[in-house]
Amino acid sequence: MSAPFVLAVPSKGRLQENAEAFFARAGLTLSKPGGARDYRGTIAGLDNVEVAYLSASEIAANLARGSVHFGVTGEDLVRESITDADKRVLLIDGLGFGYANVVVAVPQAWIDVRTMADLDDVTTGFRAQHNRRMRVATKYINLTRGFFAQHSVVDYRIVESAGATEGAPAVGTAEMIVDITTTGATLAANGLKVLDDGVLLRSQANLVASREADWSDTARETARVILDHIASRARAGKYKEVRTRFKGCNDALLAEAHSRFGVVSPFGGPTSSGMLTLHCPPAQIYALGSFLRQHGADTVSVAALDYVFDKENPLFSKLAAFLPQ
């Protein structure tokens, strides 16, 4: 019996809920046969898949080790915790939740400090005046070092933070911070501001693949099936299905619809009876419906699409190109 294909997802909170909802929308239902407290799960219809419920940081670590094939975690954790991340893991696709920015934040009282160049000047002056480097509180040690090096800021030292990083300047354990934020409200409440060019990373939850995992033929086929579900759902979300039939429906009219409304005709041009099926961007639905009626259509129906399967699977092609041959 072949080893299971392991998919790691967050074990609690909003991230778990969003991850399970994402897979459910793609027709992949995650469940815990052992109950809510079980840390192992399954996907209906994919018997060789084992779902591992882990913390977001554990998911990144397991991806680096190759003990899971796919994992759902934030790009910030991937970039921070995995050395040479682009060679060891693949960010297959952003999942549309878990948005947050990793930022440099300084006290609002520093009215003359708005950019990283300003910060460079201030840190240099601070060291000359106080004979010590400015302290930066953060849990993003590697991201901070890399970003500060890009901006030639050298007169600082990192104070590792385990939590409540935004409070460090107020209690005197650091002069500034590098932390993650969604709205900036917590930073502002603690008297901090984000530098104009101080965004290290715009992060979101990603589906990530490990190059180090055991990519047997069975594992690759399982990955193809999972990614086929995800790609077909994503493709369906871009369009509504439009149907009509009228005598004046011809190839010239279809070409104009393509040009004006960005539609695609997945099953070719109109039939001999004038029957036509189009996939149309939602924002263009009314304009397309009006256009078709102006040219002779009595009825135009519009329906939501659940899935649109295509011969090509760009997500799996991306993965196949990344994995060892």
Swiss-Prot record:
Its EC number is 2.4.2.17. It is found in: Cytoplasm. Pathway: Amino-acid biosynthesis; L-histidine biosynthesis; L-histidine from 5-phospho-alpha-D-ribose 1-diphosphate: step 1/9. GO terms for cellular component: cytoplasm. Its cofactor is Mg(2+). Keywords: Amino-acid biosynthesis, ATP-binding, Cytoplasm, Glycosyltransferase, Histidine biosynthesis, Magnesium, Metal-binding, Nucleotide-binding, Transferase. It is an enzyme of class 2 (transferase). Its main location: cytoplasm. One of its GO terms (biological process) is L-histidine biosynthetic process. One of its GO terms (molecular function) is magnesium ion binding. Pfam families: HisG (PF01634). It catalyses: 1-(5-phospho-beta-D-ribosyl)-ATP + diphosphate = 5-phospho-alpha-D-ribose 1-diphosphate + ATP. Feedback inhibited by histidine. Belongs to the ATP phosphoribosyltransferase family. Long subfamily. Catalyzes the condensation of ATP and 5-phosphoribose 1-diphosphate to form N'-(5'-phosphoribosyl)-ATP (PR-ATP). Has a crucial role in the pathway because the rate of histidine biosynthesis seems to be controlled primarily by regulation of HisG enzymatic activity. This is ATP phosphoribosyltransferase. It comes from Rhodopseudomonas palustris (strain ATCC BAA-98 / CGA009). The gene is hisG.
